[in-house]
A protein has these predicted regions:
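Vicinal oxygen chelate
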Residues: 1-10, 30-82, 89-116, 127-128
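Conserved active-site tyrosine of GNAT-family acetyltransferases
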Residues: 19-24, 94, 120
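Major-groove DNA-recognition helix of helix-turn-helix-type DNA-binding domains
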Residues: 27
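Short, glycine-anchored, charge-dense loop/turn motifs used at functional sites
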Residues: 117-123
């Protein structure tokens, strides 16, 4: 039996809604879970496309739930790396998103583009 079954990133952001809409609108992800806070705005949500799942949680709700993690929540220390079948389609889908690194060929044999999603996290798309 495998020790690990799945790895799902939880992106800690100021606002959940823009992040989930990025994946839903541009890539056809489905919203699988939503948790509103007292003001009705989402404090947590997850999206999924086939076997790929991404979770978002607000920085404020993490700090409320785990006050000791306040110092760990500044900045962004994760980049998502997504292997894709068609980089041309991805480039069209991310049009208008802030580009971190334009489309380029890498020394390890892939062609990639890196953008920022609305929460400020870097997402790289690679075609091997």
């Amino acid at each position: 039996m495998a020790l690990l079954k799945q790895l799902t990133p939880v992106l800690v952001v100021d606002a959940v809604e823009p992040g989930i809409q990025f994946w839903v609108d541009r890539f056809g992800f489905k919203i699988t879970n939503q948790v509103p806070g007292p003001d009705g705005k989402l404090v947590f949500a997850s999206v999924q496309f086939e076997d790929i799942e991404i979770m978002y949680q607000t920085r404020a709700s993490v700090m409320e739930d785990q006050p000791s993690s306040v110092g760990d929540l500044n900045g962004h220390s994760i980049a998502l790396f997504v292997t894709v079948a068609n980089l041309d389609m991805i480039e069209k889908a991310v049009e208008g998103a802030p580009v971190v690194k334009p489309r380029h060929k890498t020394f390890y044999g892939s062609e990639e583009i890196y953008v920022k999603e609305p929460g400020g996290n870097t997402v790289g798309f690679a075609k091997f």
